[in-house]
Regions:
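C-terminal substrate-binding/catalytic lobe of Rossmann-fold NAD(P)-dependent oxidoreductases
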Residues: 74-77, 82-209
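N-terminal Rossmann-like NAD(P) cofactor-binding subdomain of oxidoreductases
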Residues: 1-103, 205-209
């Protein structure tokens, strides 16, 4: 597993040196497949796929949630915002970076920046290609991030119905990857969690039935 080499050309050097498979722990370029566990792992073909991407942490959080909605309803479009803890790509003090906003001190500001997580959904749920977009807000917390997903659905729904679908999935096919809570928790309560994401049922809202 590598997070250093994010493209097939560089990651494949591991194959030349004896590795049988290479997993990129980030979005990958020109890889054989992008896999999010619980969503599309059945698309993995060990006979033909040697360099794989496990996508980003945000995509792994977002994709199971989107899968539940997409399996039960028709998504017309969607927008996500990830409120993301700072990472080692950022600077502790104002410094140099190709992204001027990420050049600012990560513990001192809320930093708007880009994320490819929403677009990556199309790689693991192909029918949603081009239907989701998003942005990131890097915030001064060291761990645990949040994804705020807003979708426009074809069907008329209620928050209770949506939550029931999430709860059922978290207790069934997505039990290893998606959790569900109705408790008034905050980010620090999720330190050490083993799942890809937790649905905060208290924050589920529906406007005009869609």
């Amino acid at each position: 597993c590598t997070g250093k080499f994010k493209g097939r050309k560089d990651a494949a050097v591991h194959l030349e040196n004896g590795a049988k498979k290479v997993i990129i722990s980030a979005p990958g370029k020109d890889v054989d497949n992008t896999i999010v566990m619980g969503v599309n792992e059945s698309s993995y073909d060990p006979a033909t796929q040697d360099v794989l991407s496990n996508a980003s942490c945000t995509t792994n959080c977002l994709a199971p949630v989107v899968k539940v909605i997409n399996d039960n309803y028709t998504i017309i479009s969607g927008m996500m915002t990830t409120v993301h803890s700072f990472t080692n790509d950022q600077k502790n003090l104002d410094s140099r970076h190709k992204d001027y906003r990420r050049a600012r001190g990560c513990t001192q500001s809320i930093i708007p920046t880009t994320t490819g997580a929403a677009k990556a959904i199309g790689l693991v749920i192909p029918e949603l290609q081009g239907k989701l977009s998003g942005m990131a807000l890097r915030v001064p917390t060291p761990n645990v991030s949040l994804v705020d997903l807003v979708v426009n659905l074809k069907e008329t729904v209620t928050a209770e119905e949506i939550n029931a679908k999430f709860k059922a999935a978290s207790e069934g096919e997505l039990k290893r990857y998606l959790a569900y809570t109705e408790k008034p928790l905050v980010s620090i309560d999720f330190n050490g969690t083993s799942v890809s994401g937790t649905v905060d049922a208290l924050s589920t809202m529906v406007m005009d039935g869609t």
